[in-house]
Amino acid sequence: MSLEEIIARCLEVGINCLGIADHNTLAGALKMKEIAPFPIIPGEEILTSDGEVIGFFLSQEIPSNLSMKETVAQIKAQDGLVCIPHPYDRLRFSVFRDQAFDDIMPDVDIIEAFNARSLSPGSSTRAWELARKYGKPASAGSDAHTLPEIGNAYVEMPDFNDKDEFLASLAKGKICGNRSNPTARLVSTWNRLKKRWS
């Protein structure tokens, strides 16, 4: 997907603010912030030794394969927000242990309670329970790897001007959307394998 295609898709489905969290890179999000006609929240989905974590409102890329604690510390050093994505999606190898939740939860800002690519409704239920247990705002993510997936999950929330207002607005937000077609995961997996082989 090109950045221009992503912008066109967002405009088509009525998205007026977009959080971008590519795997282990911030480059696309920062470039998108320069060219998009709507607000962009730059993020990075970072693979740690304990699982994945997302940093939002970042300005510098954070390396992968650090510990969860080290990664969270680097997000906070940039005054970013820490989001736990798809915490109970057991089809992903990146889900970390429950014990890790307890260790980092004081520094977590957001729990992704609905991920459009998570095939099990039970994973969303448990994620909601986790957010309530710790009093964290819940978010939703399309986790889009293909254009048609953009907008499958979103949050209707009041406008905001900065990171702190974003968190307050998110707490008042309404999660909307539907699960992606399971074939979307097959398509993105195939595309990833093609890149490796070429």
Predicted regions located by residue number:
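Active-site flanking residues adjacent to catalytic metal/cofactor-binding acidic residues
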Residues: 21, 44, 85, 142
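Charged catalytic cores and adjacent phosphate/nucleic-acid-binding surfaces used
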Residues: 1-8, 27-42, 48-66, 70-73, ...
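Divalent metal-dependent hydrolysis catalytic cores, especially in the metallo-beta-lactamase
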Residues: 6-24, 80-83
